[in-house]
């Protein structure tokens, strides 16, 4: 049974909810600053050479470490989503309301955009790399790739963080989430870029002014996240605690 709840304005603008939005903004900003910053640093060190295996590993590790830290720092305030696809997946499973989830999206996209604009400023106008599918691939292949890897990410979030039966496994949730993102970037980076995160792709698109393929990184991750939320949140988790009231973020 689908557990989606729309929510209310009162809950979405409670003090706890506003704190959650600020936490998502800050954590996403820091994650994207480190992740995109690693790609900019690679381009500078190699004079914009094509990404080689060592560079791919470096970028994947930077994203994995930064996400691990970002999720850890926001987990106790907002749940540590840092990603619209994660938020949607959790909404499909009834862990957050649609209305509050939309404000999470805004906070995440703003955090990513500010991070990329800051990077452009502090690097004296160096190019901010955007996600795009590799030569020889079409957009549909890129969408399917992003669906698969985002499904893996959100499924991991459910298994290690959202499942009420997780027990002590929840302690390692940020590590597991960082690991799956790093692994997926290693697998998908040369093909779709390995985004898994519409906000992560949106910020660079704003900073560079290039939205030509940005839709791929909304469609794929959101579909993958929703599928994972439905399968784990609505099929595997048969009982669900009521959504929190305005005393907590909704």
Curated annotation (Swiss-Prot):
Keywords: Membrane, Repeat, Transmembrane, Transmembrane helix, Transport, Vacuole. GO terms for cellular component: plant-type vacuole membrane. Pfam families: MIP. It is a multi-pass membrane protein. NCBIfam families: MIP (TIGR00861). Aquaporins contain two tandem repeats each containing three membrane-spanning domains and a pore-forming loop with the signature motif Asn-Pro-Ala (NPA). Belongs to the MIP/aquaporin (TC 1.A.8) family. TIP (TC 1.A.8.10) subfamily. This is Probable aquaporin TIP-type. The lineage of its organism: Eukaryota, Viridiplantae, Streptophyta, Embryophyta, Tracheophyta.
């Amino acid at each position: 049974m689908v557990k989606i709840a729309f929510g209310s304005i009162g809950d979405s603008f409670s003090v706890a909810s506003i704190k959650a939005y600020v936490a998502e903004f800050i954590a996403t900003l820091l994650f994207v600053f480190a992740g995109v910053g690693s790609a900019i640093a690679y381009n500078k060190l190699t004079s914009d050479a094509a990404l080689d295996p060592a560079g791919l590993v470096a970028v994947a590790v930077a994203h994995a470490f930064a996400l691990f830290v970002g999720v850890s720092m926001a987990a106790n305030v907002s749940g540590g989503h840092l990603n619209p696809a994660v938020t949607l997946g959790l909404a499909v499973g009834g862990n957050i309301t649609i209305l509050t989830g939309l404000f999470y999206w805004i906070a995440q996209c703003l955090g990513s955009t500010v991070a990329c604009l800051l990077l452009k400023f502090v690097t004296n106008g160096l190019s901010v790399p955007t996600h795009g599918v590799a030569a020889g691939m079409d957009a549909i292949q890129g969408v399917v790739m992003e669906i698969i890897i985002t499904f893996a990410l959100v499924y991991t979030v459910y298994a290690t963080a959202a499942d009420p039966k997780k027990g002590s496994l929840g302690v390692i949730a940020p590590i597991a989430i960082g690991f799956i993102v790093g692994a997926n970037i290693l697998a998908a980076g040369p093909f779709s870029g390995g985004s898994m995160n519409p906000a992560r792709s949106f910020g660079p698109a704003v900073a560079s002014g290039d939205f030509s393929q940005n839709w791929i990184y909304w469609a794929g991750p959101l579909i993958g996240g929703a599928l994972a939320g439905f399968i784990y949140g609505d099929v595997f988790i048969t009982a669900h605690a009521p959504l929190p009231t305005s005393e907590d973020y909704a």
